[in-house]
Amino acid sequence: MRQRTIVCPLIQNDGCYLLCKMADNRGVFPGQWALSGGGVEPGERIEEALRREIREELGEQLILSDITPWTFRDDIRVKTYADGRQEEIYMIYLIFDCVSANRDICINDEFQDYAWVRPEEFALYDLNVATRHTLRLKGLL
């Protein structure tokens, strides 16, 4: 089984948290709402990976005014590729508290939508199990 280290930002702006709706045909949780993030590349430092993933998935315009390592956890997940192929992966999640100075987002094709959500509105979203777990750990759900 392949192992991946995943950097995952929990991005907050003015009391709202950024959620991204995964594309329907790919990813670890197709069609569900999630936190952004992705894998650390070989030779890449953790914060470099976090900033790269944010740029790739959320665009160049989002400005983070604060990044603080928060927690980690691990899990085994099934990733679905665009061609329908699936792979079981052991994932180590490194989760960061992030504060954004703005809400300027330009999502890539990994996502079909995004929303800035107040904690009391989380129940209105089909959150994937990993995101629900993270939000519970943070005391937001």
UniProtKB/Swiss-Prot annotation:
Keywords: Hydrolase, Magnesium. It holds the Pfam family NUDIX. One of its GO terms (molecular function) is magnesium ion binding. It is an enzyme of class 3 (hydrolase). Its cofactor is Mg(2+). The keyword Hydrolase applies. Its EC number is 3.6.1.9, 3.6.1.12, 3.6.1.-, 3.6.1.23. A motif (Nudix box) lies at residues 38-59. It catalyses: a ribonucleoside 5'-triphosphate + H2O = a ribonucleoside 5'-phosphate + diphosphate + H(+); a 2'-deoxyribonucleoside 5'-triphosphate + H2O = a 2'-deoxyribonucleoside 5'-phosphate + diphosphate + H(+); dUTP + H2O = dUMP + diphosphate + H(+); dTTP + H2O = dTMP + diphosphate + H(+). Residues 1-141 form the Nudix hydrolase domain. Catalyzes the hydrolysis of nucleoside triphosphates, with a preference for pyrimidine deoxynucleoside triphosphates (dUTP, dTTP and dCTP). Belongs to the Nudix hydrolase family. NudI subfamily. Monomer. This is Nucleoside triphosphatase NudI. The gene is nudI.
